[in-house]
Amino acid sequence: GAAMSLIAGNLGVVQRLLDAQQLTWGICAGAAAHLYGDRRPIQDVDLLVTTGQLPTVVKLLQQQQKAVQFDGQRILWRGIKVFDDLTIRRNGVVYPYTLDSLMASQLRRMPLLGAMVLVLSPEDVLLHKVAMGRGAEEGKHDLADAAGIIRRQKFDLDYMRQRLQVMNATAALKPILANLGV
């Protein structure tokens, strides 16, 4: 629809800017789940950059005369949200989730809405969705997205084990993953 074509042009702008600066970045969350699993319509595109890079991205966009919103935690610009930390806090537990060198080593280049974007690995997208774990009762699709990714992807289980350790999530998430068939 119209929203997706608007986002497409904006995503192309962001992709070219970040790549020109050789920044490390990746599409994450819903848009990545769309690429790896069920093709739900894309409402917006979430991007993860390395820790501390948000001010750099703000400056790059402002140099292009883009009016961005930045609250210190995330950048919002025309359907694109940029984060540098997606650490999850649930039920008093903290699951660290940042674009570290391990996650960066698993990035892949794929087409999304006409732009050749970098995307977090299916393992990283899956673990984020499972850790968030929100369902329809919260108006979210985390577990449905997780199931879709599992149906359509093969996983590097060694890498998944490493990421679970980094997230301090092995005990919490392994049973959920097993129930989902991983």
Residue spans for each PLM region:
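Compositionally biased terminal segments of proteins
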Residues: 1-182
